[in-house]
């Protein structure tokens, strides 16, 4: 994934093992995967890079202050989140994988130095996404075991540093990941191990009810999905924990971040109201749900489909993750550890719908209806979602969302201020758009895109022109 030229911009100083602190870490812990975890167990890991601007970041300061503080606080935080130091395994006689932590298990913590241009990686102009890859630590995954998470901290001398997280999606969802990062940041900044109740993880798996045997249905669906990737052949090892094949990303794939202000979003809201009232298309019986998510996602996916261009009859689809904690009956605690995320997908669409004059409005109607239809039954549809990918037409453009404006990633202060930029690197592995709250806390939305250069040029133009009109 990382070529020699990129590797030369990075010097690895140390690769350490960080173990959880305190006496609790002397106890073993086993957590079975739930059906929510199994939805994600073959998908690519989630890679985040959090940049901090710090012109005082000399190598001596990095070595003597930043790295020791991060390692000590990481060890302390892991004592509350023991499964992160453990491994994902699938024993021969077990019906499904489980997370196992045993004393002396540890996370990998890489310390590195980069001569890359910090301001370019955190700036507003598009740049090759492969420039981010040296900053992301490897995550060990083999047939019989997988690490839960790995970390890397990289110095950009006299510019700043970044903290990178590579997280296995079967172990934790975005909510759990950001809860852990908030715990780590708080511990590092305050130099104490106290955590408020909302950051203390809940490990009780009985809060996830499975009366429909979704576990088995999801594993069977994954078996059929795997056969699509092997040309119809039976997988050699049905219990392999190796992730699905991911595409090789070349130097022609570019990364771009768009900041939509609250005013931009309001402008798009008014445009949808106006288009809806004067639309030639028969109105939906339901009123449009013009939430920030509906507006922003509809706008982004419309621009992405237009940027791809091509045959208007080509197949497209869209989807987004759904946090089910509050949808479940009874509700699942907000600090539940693991995955409590399903997904909503709408397939069998054509590009023509979005490329037309009223494409933005058509997208908003569909996304609005998708959001309005969400209830506790969204979890029951997981096997159906996976089955849908076995019959997908080749070349279908399927757009999705990574992250959320609710995670509060720009509040991750480890003691050196707010992040300069937070990047979800793993959107390269699928046509995903990353979502985060705006850095300035003004109610805007930050979107991340990853596209081939020629499409990115068109996309940037479409995104900005749409806001001008």
UniProtKB/Swiss-Prot annotation:
UniProt keyword Mitochondrion, yes or no: no
Residues annotated as binding malonyl-CoA: 291-292
Active site: 169 (proton acceptor), 413 (proton acceptor)
Deletion phenotype: No visible phenotype, but no malonylation of glucosides.
Enzyme class: transferase
Residue positions, PTM N-acetylmethionine: 1
HXXXD motif, short sequence motif: residues: 169-173
Pfam families in alphabetical order: Transferase (PF02458)
An annotated Gene Ontology molecular function: O-malonyltransferase activity
Keywords on record: Acetylation, Acyltransferase, Detoxification, Transferase
GO terms classed as biological process: response to toxic substance
UniProt catalytic activity: a flavonol 3-O-beta-D-glucoside + malonyl-CoA = a flavonol 3-O-(6-O-malonyl-beta-D-glucoside) + CoA; a flavonol 7-O-beta-D-glucoside + malonyl-CoA = a flavonol 7-O-(6-O-malonyl-beta-D-glucoside) + CoA
Protein EC: 2.3.1.-, 2.3.1.116
Domain of life (superkingdom): Eukaryota
Motif DFGWG motif: where in chain: 413-417
Main function: Malonyltransferase acting on xenobiotic glucosides. Has activity toward 2-Naphthol glucoside (2NAG), 1-Naphthol glucoside (1NAG), kaempferol 7-O-glucoside, kaempferol 3-O-glucoside, hydroxycoumarin glucosides, phenol-glucosides and isoflavone glucoside (daidzin), but not toward 4-coumaroyl glucoside, kaempferol 3,7-O-diglucoside, salicylic acid glucoside and phlorizin. In vivo, seems to be involved in the malonylation of 2-Naphthol glucoside while PMAT2 would be involved in the malonylation of 4-methylumbelliferone glucoside or 4-nitrophenyl glucoside.
Record-stated family: Belongs to the plant acyltransferase family. Phenolic glucoside malonyltransferase subfamily.
Record-given protein name: Phenolic glucoside malonyltransferase 1
Taxonomic path: Eukaryota, Viridiplantae, Streptophyta, Embryophyta, Tracheophyta
């Amino acid at each position: 994934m990382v070529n020699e030229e990129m590797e030369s911009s990075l010097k690895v100083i140390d690769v350490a093992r960080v173990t959880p602190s305190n006496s609790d870490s002397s106890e073993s812990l086993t957590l079975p995967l739930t059906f929510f975890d199994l939805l994600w167990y073959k998908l690519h890991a989630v890679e985040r890079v959090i940049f901090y601007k710090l012109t005082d970041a000399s190598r001596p300061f990095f070595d003597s202050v930043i790295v020791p503080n991060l390692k000590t606080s990481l060890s302390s935080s892991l004592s509350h989140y023991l499964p992160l130091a453990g491994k994902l395994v699938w024993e021969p006689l077990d019906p499904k994988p489980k997370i196992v932590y045993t004393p002396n298990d540890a996370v990998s913590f890489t310390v590195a130095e980069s001569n890359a241009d910090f301001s370019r990686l955190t700036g507003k102009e598009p740049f090759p996404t492969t420039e981010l890859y040296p900053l992301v630590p490897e995550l060990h995954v083999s047939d019989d075991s997988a690490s839960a998470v790995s970390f890397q901290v990289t110095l950009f001398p006299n510019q700043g540093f970044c903290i990178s997280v590579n997280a296995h999606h079967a172990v934790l969802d975005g909510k759990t990941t950001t809860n852990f990062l908030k715990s780590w940041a708080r511990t590092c900044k305050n130099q104490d191990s106290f955590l408020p109740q909302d950051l203390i993880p809940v490990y009780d798996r009985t809060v996830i009810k499975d009366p429909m045997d979704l576990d088995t249905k999801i594993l069977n669906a994954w078996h059929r999905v795997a056969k699509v990737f092997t040309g119809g052949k039976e997988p050699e090892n049905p219990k392999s924990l190796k992730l699905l094949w991911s595409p090789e990303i070349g130097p022609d794939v570019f990364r771009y971040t768009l900041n939509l202000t609250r005013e931009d979003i309001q402008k798009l809201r008014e445009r949808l109201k106006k288009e809806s009232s004067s639309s030639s298309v028969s109105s939906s019986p339901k009123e449009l749900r013009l939430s920030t998510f509906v507006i922003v996602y509809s706008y982004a996916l419309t621009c992405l489909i237009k940027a791809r261009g091509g045959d208007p009859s080509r197949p497209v689809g869209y989807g987004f993750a759904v946090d089910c904690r509050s949808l479940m009956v009874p509700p699942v605690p907000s600090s539940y550890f693991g995955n409590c995320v399903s997904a909503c997908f709408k397939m069998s669409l054509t590009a023509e719908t979005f490329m037309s004059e009223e494409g933005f409005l058509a997208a908003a109607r569909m996304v609005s209806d998708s959001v309005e239809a969400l209830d506790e039954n969204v979890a029951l549809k997981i096997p159906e979602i996976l089955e849908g990918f076995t019959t997908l037409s080749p070349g279908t453009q399927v757009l999705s969302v990574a992250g959320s404006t609710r995670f509060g990633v720009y509040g991750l202060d480890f003691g050196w201020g707010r992040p300069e930029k937070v990047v979800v690197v793993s959107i390269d592995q699928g046509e995903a758009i990353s979502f985060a709250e705006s850095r300035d806390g003004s109610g805007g939305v930050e979107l991340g895109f990853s596209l081939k250069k020629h499409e990115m040029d068109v996309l940037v133009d479409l995104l900005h022109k749409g806001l001008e009109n």
